[in-house]
Regions:
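Amphipathic, Lys/Arg-enriched alpha-helical "gate/interface" segment within cytosolic domains
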Residues: 2-153
Length: 153
């Protein structure tokens, strides 16, 4: 399973792969890349992927997560609700509070994400993300730049 990718001179090691996504880790940046490899991830598989990140944080220092959704073509509200209301809350306790997202270049997908967040905040609370920083970026390199700037300040 030794497959590595390099962004901005940082080597990311493949640490988990399933039929739906790949997880890569870089210890210097304390960052995990979660890359959706397919157009749709069923909710049970979606939960397994993110539960794997929860397990990884027990073994590795992870302060930054980038979820690259560019390959997704299906928006699934129940997955997003679980991700926001359950998973992000549990992972916040473990110190993973910096989340980066790359959305598909599809206007309807962006609108669905915004509408989905609105519904989640209405159902749970608008301060659901207190203590969690979410940044939307266009590239993995942009997220790395942001991490480097924040660690040098």
């Amino acid at each position: 399973m030794m497959e590595n990718i390099i962004y901005k001179g940082f080597e990311f090691n493949l640490i988990y792969r399933c039929s739906y996504s790949s997880l890569f880790y870089n210890s210097n940046l304390e960052m995990v890349l979660c890359i959706a490899d397919v157009e749709y991830i069923p909710i049970e598989n979606f939960k397994t992927i993110f539960d794997s990140i929860s397990e990884l944080i027990e073994k590795h220092s992870i302060k930054h997560l980038l979820f690259d959704k560019r390959n997704l073509r299906t928006f699934h509200q129940p997955s997003m609700e679980w991700y926001f209301a359950v998973w992000k809350q549990s992972i916040k306790e473990k110190g993973l509070v910096n989340h980066y997202k790359i959305l598909p270049d599809l206007e309807w997908f962006v609108q669905a994400v915004n509408a989905g967040k609105h519904e989640i905040f209405k159902k749970y609370n608008s301060n659901l993300l207190n203590g969690i920083r979410v940044s939307y970026v266009d590239t993995i390199e942009k997220a790395i730049d942001d991490i480097l700037i924040s660690t040098n300040n």
